[in-house]
């Protein structure tokens, strides 16, 4: 009887958060978050989209649990009402692993302590939407970690992912009115992927969360750590990243999601026992356009005329947006319009500003998008 050929699973995940054990580097950020968890210091974690923020949070939750801290991750993506936020909070507690905190949570539910929210997938008895009813339920939900801490004596870490949505719902005052009383029993990570909205929440003196959390910015991955990660996984599956590795690293320039996408495609084009060379790289590069086209074209089409000019100029390495090159080559207007557009693009997470004052440098968050822009919005390899 012929033996079945074993089909290997591609080791590079690009379309969802990485499992905690597969996180790429982030040792410095993990150390900061672990220290703040020990010291009960709240954190506002901000990063552009696709920089691995959720993967980092999942690893932080896993590490906290291993250290004896009760920890939950609340996903607020797509939440539009107080009732929906309450449902997501209860859903996070439903995912608690077996242990004292889980037992305390089950006890609350058995003795009428359930908040009674209908989550998107079902699971409780009463549907709550917008308005005062939703806010009353949310108040109870927000107090859950402290109630569990009182029952168990165990400290609790709560990580809110996509926390910027509370700004749209104008719920930041309500949230702070509850959690400010939790003392040293509970601490929080407020994570968001819209830099401008996160700044509005935590840096605007008029907002309730002003000064309530220590900042932590998530940047690109170090080249050496990323190279080691890719090489290790190629070797573990009987392949060699070869000279294509350098081309990949040059292209993605530390962008976490783009690195995983191109590594995934390069691995697919590399036969077992083979080295990834030019043919494999060209195949991976060609395939990538099918994954990126919709995102790139939608991003470009969303820009105003001035914003498009700013993106064009910055992608080409121009920093003086109102200088001769900005005006004559990229059609940027005189005055403050170009700088205001750049500020908006930084807030939206399309541009990032490094340094300050005269030394400040603008660059595109996504280096692969930048290459596409420089190529005249064509998908082509550049020399």
Model-derived features: positions:
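A short, basic N-terminal segment
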Residues: 1-43, 48, 99, 113, ...
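P-loop NTPase nucleotide-binding core
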Residues: 41-51, 55-157, 186, 336
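Amphipathic alpha-helical "lid/sensor" segments that cap RecA-like P-loop NTPase cores
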Residues: 231-295
């Amino acid at each position: 009887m012929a033996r079945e050929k074993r089909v290997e699973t591609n080791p590079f995940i690009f379309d969802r958060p990485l499992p905690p054990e597969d996180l790429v580097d982030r040792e410095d950020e993990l150390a900061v978050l672990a220290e703040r968890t020990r010291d009960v210091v709240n954190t506002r974690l901000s990063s552009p989209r696709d920089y691995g923020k959720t993967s980092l949070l999942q690893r932080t939750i896993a590490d906290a649990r291993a250290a004896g801290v009760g920890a939950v991750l609340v996903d607020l993506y797509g939440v539009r009402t107080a009732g929906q936020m309450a449902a997501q909070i209860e859903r996070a507690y439903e995912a608690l692993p077996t242990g004292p905190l889980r037992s305390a949570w089950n006890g609350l539910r058995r003795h009428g302590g359930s908040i009674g929210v209908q989550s998107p997938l079902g699971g409780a008895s009463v549907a709550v939407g917008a308005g005062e009813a939703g806010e009353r339920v949310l108040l109870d939900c927000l107090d859950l970690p402290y109630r569990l801490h009182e029952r168990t004596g165990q400290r609790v870490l709560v990580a809110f992912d996509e926390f910027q949505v509370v700004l749209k719902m104008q719920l930041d005052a309500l949230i702070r009115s509850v959690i400010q009383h939790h003392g040293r029993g509970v601490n929080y990570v407020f994570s968001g992927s819209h830099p401008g909205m996160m700044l509005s929440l935590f840096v605007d003196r008029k907002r309730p969360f002003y000064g309530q959390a220590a900042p932590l910015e998530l940047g690109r991955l170090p080249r050496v750590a990323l190279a080691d990660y890719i090489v290790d996984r190629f070797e573990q599956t009987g392949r060699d990243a070869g000279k294509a590795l350098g081309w990949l690293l040059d292209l993605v320039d530390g962008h976490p999601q783009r690195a995983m996408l191109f590594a995934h495609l390069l691995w697919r084009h590399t036969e077992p026992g083979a080295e990834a060379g030019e043919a494999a790289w060209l195949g991976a590069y060609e395939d990538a356009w099918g994954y990126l086209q919709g995102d790139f074209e939608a991003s470009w089409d969303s820009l105003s005329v001035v914003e498009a000019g700013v993106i064009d100029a910055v992608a080409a390495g121009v920093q003086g947006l109102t200088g001769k090159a900005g005006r004559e080559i990229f059609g940027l207007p005189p005055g403050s319009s170009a700088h205001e557009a750049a500020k908006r693009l930084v807030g939206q997470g399309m541009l990032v500003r490094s340094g300050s004052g005269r030394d400040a440098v603008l660059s595109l968050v996504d280096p692969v998008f930048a290459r596409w822009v420089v190529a005249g919005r064509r998908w082509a390899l550049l020399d």
